[in-house]
Regions:
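Alpha-amylase-like alpha-glycosidases and glucanotransferases acting on alpha-linked glucans and related
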Residues: 1-5, 12, 18, 55-199, ...
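Catalytic domains of carbohydrate-active enzymes, especially glycoside hydrolases
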Residues: 2, 27-52, 295-297, 442
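N-terminal catalytic cores of NTP/NDP-binding nucleotidyl/phosphoryl-transfer enzymes
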Residues: 8, 12-31
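Outer-envelope exported proteins of Gram-negative bacteria
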Residues: 47, 219-221, 225, 299, ...
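Conserved, well-ordered alpha-helix/loop/beta-strand core segments that scaffold catalytic motifs
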Residues: 195-228
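Structured C-terminal cap/extension of enzyme domains
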Residues: 459-505
Length: 505
């Protein structure tokens, strides 16, 4: 796909301001949609919205299909009569409103959601009878039947076993013996329904938000990680999809070799796909996954696009990514299957990292726009990430969620020579400000789409960085201050976007 010339803002759902410990799909999200519209923006880019697990990373979700329960808006549940304000308003959701406290959320959020479920049970819909929930409860379960039952079963078994990795469950459940699963379902039927209820509420709230964004002419760019977590419903229920042994243990795991971000590479630990199996089955699982994503997003950013060409395979048990090797991916066979099943694919390819000629050829053949990141540009050479080299069919960023904030980068990561190169290149002045001058350069580029992280419009320091690759803790925590999202800021963003013909005018 090719974008008309436009711009947008990268803002994770978790980073939205508001009460109750984390951003949510209710008023905080709608207020941000209004801010985007007022700022003349076209696209709201978010991070993956799946349930977070290991290290709180949205890229290590326990499901490729489910939504994050933390994002369910409690005020909307109260408006639906499933909660009262006293059920949640006085709970301490964390000591710092500028950071997500995931431990506190884990300890307290599900108790509130269980109260909502208990109230839901009192008016549970019955087919053929008029109730406050006539059809959509059953419709949701029917439309989600390809993933929801296994996800609910996975979550219920996981909770019954102290939330340990599924590899540590009793063997009969671990290897999915039919009798053991049937007995568990019968004994824990209400628990399975609780997890279905949570996903039902997420789906209702998400689709209402998506419809609101469409009314405001804001497209949502979602993000789907290429891999799933080893401890996930997908890996447990669909082990034939992955390179695993008879017990479901990964033979090799995903990561990437040493690069700009991490000198030892990145050991992600995700199970690798059995691409031969996917090819034999016509990529049915991938078609299902992308179809679901396209039902909730307008545009998809596919993480680690280069992994569809060649991917870094690391023997299970390694402590770093250094000893991996490159293996051949599915290349265009996958994207042809997706196109044949789903039609035009509104995909943005995250094509960062070590790039082979074959990856560039795959990107060109696919027609997907790739990414350019300003923070990679100042090498002293004529880098492809310098704005004068951007092609039209790409997405320009000052930085991504894996980079420092622009202010933090300019102040603390550049050498004196690099800082001089950037200053001279953009003609930065004290009057305009370094960060504003850098953003001007991104917006002025030929790239059809420019995406600016909200943290960079706010000129947040390095402490507000979203993620540091290779760092296990203290990531994914930053939250915006609602007081900073002013009409004046929206006007400034609009003015700069209009100057470079990125608004509908």
């Amino acid at each position: 796909m090719e974008f008309k010339r436009c711009s947008g803002i990268l803002m994770p759902i978790s980073s939205l301001p508001g009460g109750y410990g984390i951003g949510s799909l209710g008023k905080p999200a709608r207020d941000f949609v209004d801010f985007l519209a007022g700022a003349g923006q076209t696209i709201w880019q978010i991070l993956p919205v799946g349930p977070t697990g290991f290290a709180d990373s949205p890229y290590q979700s326990c499901s490729a299909f489910a939504g994050n329960p933390y994002f369910i808006d409690l005020d909307l549940l109260a408006a639906d009569g499933l909660l009262t304000q006293k059920d949640y308003a006085n709970i301490n959701w964390g000591s710092d409103a500028a950071k997500v406290d995931y431990s506190t959320l884990y300890e307290k959020r599900f108790a509130v959601l269980r109260k909502a479920y208990a109230n839901f049970l009192k008016r549970r819909p019955v087919p053929g009878f008029e109730t406050p929930y006539p059809d959509d409860w059953y419709r949701f379960q029917f439309l989600s039947s390809n993933w929801l039952p296994d996800y609910c079963l996975y979550m219920a078994i996981k909770e019954a076993n102290g939330m340990v990795d599924w590899q540590r469950w009793p063997r009969a459940l671990r290897i999915r013996e039919p009798e053991a699963l049937a007995a568990f379902r019968a004994e824990h039927a209400e628990e399975l329904e609780f997890w279905a209820f949570v996903q039902y509420e997420f789906d209702r709230q998400w689709r209402a938000l998506h419809a609101y964004a469409k009314q405001k002419d804001i497209a949502i760019m979602g993000d789907i990680p290429i891999y799933v977590s080893a401890d996930s419903a997908d890996a447990w229920a669909g082990r034939e999809l992955f390179e695993t042994d008879a017990e479901g243990r990964p033979r090799r795991v995903a990561g990437c070799p040493p690069d700009y971000f991490a000198e030892d590479g990145q050991l992600w630990g995700n199970p690798l796909y059995d691409w031969e199996y996917h090819s034999r089955t016509g990529y049915a699982w991938w078609i299902s996954r992308v179809r679901h994503a396209l039902s909730i997003y307008d545009i998809l950013r596919i993480d680690h696009f280069r992994g569809f060409d060649t991917y870094w395979a690391i023997p299970a048990g390694e402590t770093t990514a250094r000893n991996g090797r490159w293996e051949q991916g599915p290349r265009m066979e996958l994207f042809r299957a997706l196109h044949n099943a789903l039609g035009s694919l509104p995909i943005v390819a995250e094509d960062l990292g070590e790039m082979f000629d074959s990856v560039r050829e795959l990107l060109a053949e696919s027609g997907f726009p790739g990414m350019k990141v300003l923070q990679f540009a100042f090498t002293g050479e004529d880098s492809v990430d310098l704005p004068h080299n951007y092609p039209r069919n790409c997405v320009a960023y000052p930085g991504t969620h894996d980079n420092n904030t622009l202010a933090g980068w300019f102040a603390g990561e550049l050498t004196a020579a690099q800082r001089k190169q950037a200053t001279d290149y953009f003609a930065l002045t004290g009057r305009e400000g370094n960060v504003r001058g850098l953003l001007r350069g991104v917006l002025a580029s030929a790239a059809a789409l420019a995406i600016i992280p909200l943290a960079d419009w706010l000129e947040e320091p390095a402490a507000s960085r979203m993620n540091t690759p290779g760092k296990a803790r203290d990531n994914w925590q930053w939250r915006a201050d609602a007081k900073k999202l002013t009409p004046a800021l929206a006007g400034e963003i609009r003015e700069l976007s209009e100057r470079y013909f990125r608004t509908a005018r």
